[in-house]
Amino acid sequence: MAEISILGAGGLTGKELLLLFSRQKEHEVVHITSDKLAGKTISEVFPEVSFPKNLVFKKHEDIVPLKSLVVLAVPNEVSVESAPKFLDAGHKVIDLSGVYRLHNQEILEKYYKLKHTRFNYINRAVFGIPEIFRDQLKNADFVSNPGCFSTSVILPIFLLGQLRKNLRPRIIVDSKSGVSGAGGRTEDSGYSYTSVYENFRAYKILSHQHEPEIREYVYSKSGLSDPEVIFTPHLLPVYRGILSTIVLEFDSEPEQDLISILENSSLNEPFIRILKTPEEIELKKVQHTNFLDISLRKRGNTLVVVSALDNLVKGAAGQALQNINLMTGAKETLGLLP
């Protein structure tokens, strides 16, 4: 169906992509890069990944096969220049960094701490949550894959349907993440598993880059006046998974059965699971899957929504494959369900 090139295939998300691609036969990975691992084979680096072709890692600057779809799993500053380069060369591109998600340049540069020299490409990117932007993704040549925390918040709120119009413009989010989603791609020892074992802490309070992402896309899809988002991420002593608790307020108490609304909104969504009670939401139920589990509870005007996903799958590589399937006309669930 499609030839795939993965730049940054030696990182956590890159490895997860290789695992997912190894489980299907319609897309073919033809090119992988990692400056640190150049010259080594997949089996040398990831012996647990059973891949049809034992590809050799190339350097980032090596020539990418002409007709391949390019997946960028590289640092933010690399994606700024790489995405336009490959688009201009005729490639379809999926960018897993955050530098093509936000449409306000000042806010983007503030939260990502860089100068964005290719901001004119922002409007070309489709935000890659398939459950919201499926029709646009089918015709996209450039997809900005969403953040893991952002997916866990934006999608549950979107599934409230028309009730979003009754929400007050203030959203409080408390998210817990394993180390692979909270900085595990960096060499910062503060995010290593040894530093969090028997430990627990908050980080990037009121400064996390997914906060403006949540604000922008909840606003654009809900009709809320520009919502205030108070987002606090925490670092769990586990490897993978995100659990988010989202507190919302309605102008007046909704009379509808909210679980039924979620169930109806997600009726044809293969990766959304609605559970009857928030207490049923657990990381172990979503780890190594592309599922997003959601539940909620209401008291008066207050609504508490709980969601969970695997940050490396639905929060990154799995959602990227879901988008690739849509972009190439493949079955959306290809490589993502048993």
UniProtKB/Swiss-Prot annotation:
Its EC number is 1.2.1.38. It catalyses: N-acetyl-L-glutamate 5-semialdehyde + phosphate + NADP(+) = N-acetyl-L-glutamyl 5-phosphate + NADPH + H(+). CDD domains: AGPR_1_C (cd23934), AGPR_1_N (cd17895). Pathway: Amino-acid biosynthesis; L-arginine biosynthesis; N(2)-acetyl-L-ornithine from L-glutamate: step 3/4. It is an enzyme of class 1 (oxidoreductase). Keywords: Amino-acid biosynthesis, Arginine biosynthesis, Cytoplasm, NADP, Oxidoreductase. Its main location: cytoplasm. GO terms for cellular component: cytoplasm. It comes from the Bacteria. One of its GO terms (biological process) is L-arginine biosynthetic process. HAMAP family: ArgC_type1. Catalyzes the NADPH-dependent reduction of N-acetyl-5-glutamyl phosphate to yield N-acetyl-L-glutamate 5-semialdehyde. NCBIfam families: argC. Belongs to the NAGSA dehydrogenase family. Type 1 subfamily. PANTHER family: N-ACETYL-GAMMA-GLUTAMYL-PHOSPHATE REDUCTASE, CHLOROPLASTIC-RELATED, N-ACETYL-GAMMA-GLUTAMYL-PHOSPHATE REDUCTASE, CHLOROPLASTIC-RELATED-RELATED. This is N-acetyl-gamma-glutamyl-phosphate reductase.
